[in-house]
Amino acid sequence: MNDERRSASRKPSTAAIEVTDTISGETIGRVGNLSRTGMLLICHRPLNDNALYQLRFRLPDPFGAQSEIETGVHTMWTEQASTDGYQWSGLRIISISGRSAASLDKWLEHGAG
C-alpha cells in the first residue's frame, strides 16, 4: 500500500507479536508493522477482504512488561506473501478502548519493540 494514503506512519515490529482472533480463539498471524490507525498482519490463516475482525495481541514495553491490546479491525486489502501458505493483510483499526490506545501510543513512542 502507498504510504501517502495512510493517516499515520507505521512502525515495524522487531519482536514476534502473535495476533489472536478473539472470536475463534485462533492465533492467525503476527504483526508486521503497526500504527495508531492500522497494521500489517502477516497471516498463516487467510483473512477475507473487506471483513471485520476482533483481535488481541500483547505489546512488549521497554521495561519488560506486556500490554494486552484488543481492537476491532477492518480488512482493507490482502495479498499472497512470497512464502507459501502466508498472506499479508492491511488492517484499519476501527475500535480500540482508551486503555488499549494509551498502551499502543506508549509502545509507538518508545521505539516499538
Regions found by a protein language model. Name each.
Residues 36, 78-84:
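Short, conserved beta-turn/loop elements at beta-strand boundaries and strand-helix junctions
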Residues 1-34, 109-113:
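N-terminal helix initiation/capping motif
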Residues 13, 82-113:
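C-terminal output/interaction extensions
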Residues 60-70:
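Short, Lys/Arg- and Gly-enriched loop/turn segments at beta-strand edges
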Residues 42-45, 60:
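Beta-strand-rich interaction surfaces with strong enrichment in secreted/lumenal proteins
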Residues 29-31, 69-79:
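Short beta-strand-centered aromatic/proline hotspots
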